[in-house]
UniProtKB/Swiss-Prot annotation:
Plays an essential role in the initiation and regulation of chromosomal replication. ATP-DnaA binds to the origin of replication (oriC) to initiate formation of the DNA replication initiation complex once per cell cycle. Binds the DnaA box (a 9 base pair repeat at the origin) and separates the double-stranded (ds)DNA. Forms a right-handed helical filament on oriC DNA; dsDNA binds to the exterior of the filament while single-stranded (ss)DNA is stabiized in the filament's interior. This is Chromosomal replication initiator protein DnaA. One of its GO terms (cellular component) is plasma membrane. PANTHER family: CHROMOSOMAL REPLICATION INITIATOR PROTEIN DNAA (PTHR30050:SF2). It comes from Jannaschia sp. (strain CCS1).
Amino acid sequence: MTNDTWNEVRQDLLKVVGKNNFSAWIEPIDFDRIDERTAHFHVPTNFIGSWVTNNFGDLILRQLSAHGAGADRVKFTVSPKAGAAVAAPANTSAPRPVPEMAAAAPAPAPVHHTAPAPAPVAAPAQPRELPGAKLNPNFTFANFVVGKPNELAHAAARRVAETLDVTFNPLFLYGGVGLGKTHLMHAIAWDLQDRHPDAKILFLSAEQFMHRFVRALREQDTFNFKETFRSVDILMVDDVQFIAGKTSTQQEFFHTFNALVEMGKQIVISGDRAPVDMEELDNRIASRLQCGLVVDIHPTDYELRLGVLQHKAELLGAKYPHITFATGVLEYLAQKISSNVRVLEGALTRLFAFADLVRREVTVDLAKECLTDVLRATDKKVTMDEILKKTCEYYKIRQVDMISQNRQRVIARPRQMAMYLCKRLTTRSLPEIGKKFGGRDHTTILYGVRKIEELMQADSQIAEDAELLRRTLEA
């Protein structure tokens, strides 16, 4: 049989198995010969040969027979050159506006981008293998302000970025919104790309991981999905808490995680809580995440906030060189806005733009005028002590009973309500909340939180109690 005949067979197979199955399983096959009623083919991996034998072997034999090339069985031999003749997509030499996950073809050469805002260092080139998410050119180590709350996370991130050799596997960064987790993730990718231009770095959010997996299932193309994720040098997944409770996605993530660890590949993951605090996260995943280095990025302190503002002011000052600041403005903002870095930087950006429009010097009074809503929103901080106090007053019980081992419903239900409010209105972890409630285990706190959530759906009085207490605490 000639190669022309095999090409005709391939076209018939395409019509039968569909484009996705054809691309994943038939296209990588190279015809060799038919010898003693055995059709010989070359394949790039044993896995492909085994899969095609089990799923398409009989179909291939029927199509061969239909084209006058009779054979009784198929035999696959692994060859590194198999599939090399398959044409790459025409657009692989140009940067893609929306990178695709299924990027098995050679990646484009680095493309240099200029940061939209002035920065002390030039924006790095986009890494060659980032099919999941585009990196922010401003999220580099040079633009990351280090202070006591984040110095350990910064040091760990720098260590991982120094080499392709596995350092901490995985490195797990966690903390509240706007504290710098994503910034450090991007910075690691930029630094690794700078040191190792040929490295395959896959950075994406957990939500993107889930959507790509669901699409692969829908299109019956899980092979390419697995190949994409398991052929990388570094896998970086942001906001892993998103897949908690999503059984199939968690199972695939678990297998991907294990495969990369076994191959000695570096994994970096971020989340909004410690693995032990993630409700509905598969215990196997939580256990794996805790096997590496788990680093908490703490809420900002005054010194760090002031440093962030000073750095941001330098960048914005290049864009608005005519704007002047009165003494004490940055210190005032650092003192008043303590929620997170994102809010802090957004407030300063707004202040610069406002001062530019009204052509006035930036003073504390101007800041109060411009940032009324931001300052009001950050004025009130709910603490666990306040929650215990207000909940005890509302239900008319003693605080000593609240943290006791008393299991009577008249005490247990208010206790669970207070646990629920602590979880919803503060950034405290489950173990921290448990410590506040007489040293209870984090699983007890989680049970209490879920119990109130369940009761709120069925009991309007419980829902009303929770809402009234929330309003009282946030007033």
